[in-house]
Amino acid sequence: MNILILQGPNLNLLGLKSAQMKERLTLDKLNKKIKTEIKLQNIQLKFLQTHKNFQAINFLQRNRNKAKGLLFIPTSWARTNYTILETINLIKIKTSVIYFEHPYNFGTDENKSIFHGENIKSFTGQPVSSCVEGIKQFLKE
């Protein structure tokens, strides 16, 4: 099973955010922990972290027929990026949208997000656990 992981703007600064709390969680460490948590499953992950809307849309469109699901950490895109929402709805990909709890929150929570829909389920929590929970949703179906 192929899962796309789309990571939105400023998520590359996760290490900076965690350092303020005297922790050491970087984006690379988050990705490695996700891979470790699901390694016994028959899942292949394809990651993209970007600040650029067009790259995110290209990633979704080009991989739409190869992936069973999308794990999406929208960060600031959660409030305003209707183009990505439209793309998710058009390609009808099952989507887990991830929101980090405080202190890892990037400013937008599920209540302020535009990412809701028939194929979209939201998960809120600490970075690793919420991402793993979002991926496990695809195993249930």
Mark where each language-model region is:
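Short glycine-rich anion-binding loops that position phosphate/pyrophosphate groups of nucleotides
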Residues: 9-11, 75-78, 101-103
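Short, acidic/small-residue loops that bind anionic groups at enzyme active sites
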Residues: 88-108
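Short, glycine-/small-residue-rich phosphate/pyrophosphate-handling segment
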Residues: 47, 104-141
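Glycine- and acidic-residue-enriched helix-capping/strand-helix junction motifs
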Residues: 13-29
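Short beta->alpha junction loops
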Residues: 44-54
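Short acidic/histidine-rich motifs immediately flanking catalytic phosphotransfer sites
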Residues: 63-70
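Short acidic active-site motifs
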Residues: 55-59, 80
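Extreme N-terminal starter segment of soluble prokaryotic enzymes
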Residues: 1-4
